Amino acid sequence: MIYKVLYQKDQIVNPRRETTKTLFLEADNVVAARTMVEDNTPYNIELIQELTGNSLAYEKQNPDFKLTTFKSEDK
């Protein structure tokens, strides 16, 4: 499944909508997606949303859409 993760770059600064970033990743479930991000980044996760159907098709139209992979996934 593909997940959209909304996050802040670090956990020190309070979250602000204006500084929220997005990444997309493939994981078996939302818990696995959260674990991947937490284990490989210092990000403050705001929301993890599963993308399917029209939502996924819409996101794929964005030229910045790309799946993020982490080296620890290669175990």
Swiss-Prot record:
It catalyses: RNA(n) + a ribonucleoside 5'-triphosphate = RNA(n+1) + diphosphate. GO terms for biological process: DNA-templated transcription. Its EC number is 2.7.7.6. It holds the Pfam family RpoY. GO terms for cellular component: DNA-directed RNA polymerase complex. It comes from the Bacteria. Transmembrane segments: none annotated. Keywords: DNA-directed RNA polymerase, Nucleotidyltransferase, Transcription, Transferase. One of its GO terms (molecular function) is DNA-directed RNA polymerase activity. Belongs to the RNA polymerase subunit epsilon family. NCBIfam families: PRK13667.1 (NF010188). HAMAP family: RNApol_bact_RpoY. A non-essential component of RNA polymerase (RNAP). RNAP is composed of a core of 2 alpha, a beta and a beta' subunit. The core is associated with a delta subunit, and at least one of epsilon or omega. When a sigma factor is associated with the core the holoenzyme is formed, which can initiate transcription. This is DNA-directed RNA polymerase subunit epsilon. It comes from Lactobacillus gasseri (strain ATCC 33323 / DSM 20243 / BCRC 14619 / CIP 102991 / JCM 1131 / KCTC 3163 / NCIMB 11718 / NCTC 13722 / AM63). The gene is rpoY.
